[in-house]
């Protein structure tokens, strides 16, 4: 029996035959080209063909796994048309007199290395997207065939890495689990696994070191372990655990469509946190009442240049339409600190967590801010969009935001562009905002308490420093007292207050939050039903 550790992308237990997927590596040779113009045209033709193929993949994914998962292929089309990517390929052809295949391969290496080196895990996941579109181009240019994954029976798919174009073409009935050596929890494969509700592991080092194709495997998505050729004792133990898990899952699934209300009638809203359009499928599949946090900064982080108003509008409009009237709270740009974006040209800071970030960037770079607000106000005409501003610490910041909002609305009205009337709220994630929350509550429609940063700033602990893990205590009495104060101040002003940080998903505090009168919890989609069960089993009057 072999045992390998990985990082869980989704929980669950899978038992079955292993299917190893190893795609044929494309050998790209460097060739001297005399006619660079013809070679550049050959590349442009390949881009057109790739865009056409991606359109077909989008249609297939749309039918099989929904619009949110299909959106990855629209993103790939945008990446193919990206000016920086295209310019890099064309310049290499021109400057080095080389074939288009080689120029694409070089560009792929450069761009994927850039993404892979980023601190943010979501952005590291974009390295695979770059490689995927590049391999598609090289296949078209060289006249090759795309790899496909085929299996005669439901199997555990194990691979070095899996690209979106590979997973979408699989027969979903034949997939028990995904296990990859590389990848990230934000990769398309991980998101697809969460949508399908099957266990998945990424970063599973060494799993392909042995010849394992056709052997029996066990994937434990809860503990991040895969067993190859398990002994009878391990197999029997996991069969029992799998049966127990299936029973628990069925019980939780029965809670879909049920109200988030306690035994004594206390109501609370359960919303979901997401970072991209693809995750909307998870929001809907887990029966969330809305989106409590859409992290719009990822629209910026996955690019090499500023997204246009139209690009942002289309994304926010998709969110609004997919949620079909349910609230979708979109947080404005939250770049800075641990989320850096090179093309913003921000100065290097000694302490970025206390530096120019989030709303501070927006209020000093109003051109960027107004572009995003224009897109949000336009999209609000298509659904129930709320706008949320991060990192607030001062009353004057709210006043300035209101001025900019009014400027944007006036500009759109002058252009006769349709807009909605979105609710606007703020994140309470600085002690300053918590302490003046009684005054802030008079100027906004809702509060969302960001417990990650609130804990960091309250306890003076850098949450990015692993040496301080012992000191980072989100259960600290000071943090909980601050949350209670914010909730009370919100209610006095007649607005609602929710929690969107890690604490929201902490089941040991669910009853405490109910007792405090918290109106909304926003958590990862997979935590919705387990927390709903706790809520429905609780009598607040007895706490």
Language model: regions and residue ranges:
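Conserved, well-structured core domains of diverse proteins
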Residues: 1-145
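Acidic, glycine-rich flexible loop/linker segments
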Residues: 2-28, 142, 149-154, 158-285
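Conserved active-site and cofactor/substrate-binding residues in soluble primary-metabolism enzymes
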Residues: 38-41, 45, 71, 84, ...
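Generic secondary-structure signature for well-ordered alpha-helical cores
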Residues: 48, 52-66, 78-85, 91-98, ...
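Residues within well-formed alpha-helices
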Residues: 49, 133, 188-192, 282, ...
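Short, charged N-terminal helix-start/capping segments
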Residues: 80-128, 194-218, 294, 302-321, ...
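N-terminal-biased segments
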Residues: 113-151, 219-242, 440-471
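Conserved alpha/beta-domain cores
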Residues: 249-543
